[in-house]
From Swiss-Prot:
Keyword presence, Ribonucleoprotein: yes
PROSITE patterns, alphabetized: RIBOSOMAL_L24
Keywords annotated in UniProt: Ribonucleoprotein, Ribosomal protein, RNA-binding, rRNA-binding
Biological process terms in GO annotation: translation
Function: One of two assembly initiator proteins, it binds directly to the 5'-end of the 23S rRNA, where it nucleates assembly of the 50S subunit. Located at the polypeptide exit tunnel on the outside of the subunit.
Entry-linked NCBIfam families: rplX_A_E
One family name in Pfam for this protein: KOW
Name this protein carries in UniProt: Large ribosomal subunit protein uL24
GO cellular component: large ribosomal subunit
SMART domains: KOW
Cystine connections: none
Length: 121
């Protein structure tokens, strides 16, 4: 089956917005740290709850924290410690795009994920 892919930005945005859940995981991958990259012979992997990530871009660049939640609909991550203060003084989590983070420690509680990553044979 041939997939026709458009170059047009509006159609690219529409495809991301209307993507089914089983393909949204592709948008939720992030770069691995140099140490993990060498260990697993892989450059990127899907971010899951429990991974430790370092924010590379934006106001929170340099902050490191554990992923508290992964928002499949918005394709965003909620990282522990990345908070903004509202006008009334309450703090709320600031969602981060997966392309702006680097995975520094993997959550390997899922044996299938560990097997899929391999040990760098």
């Amino acid at each position: 089956m041939v997939r026709i892919v458009s170059k047009q930005p509006r159609k690219q945005r529409k495809a991301r917005y209307n993507a089914p859940n089983h393909t949204r995981g592709r948008f939720l991958s992030a770069a691995l740290s140099p140490e993990l990259r060498g260990k697993y012979n892989s450059r990127r992997t899907r971010v899951v709850k429990g991974d430790t990530v370092k924010v590379l871009r934006g106001d929170f660049a340099g902050d490191e924290g554990v992923v508290d939640a992964v928002d499949m609909k918005a394709c965003r991550l909620v990282v522990h410690g990345v908070m903004v203060t509202k006008a009334d003084g309450t703090e709320v989590p600031r969602p981060v795009d997966p392309s702006n983070v680097q995975i520094t420690k993997l959550n390997l509680k899922d044996k299938l994920r560990e097997e899929r990553l391999g040990g760098g044979a």
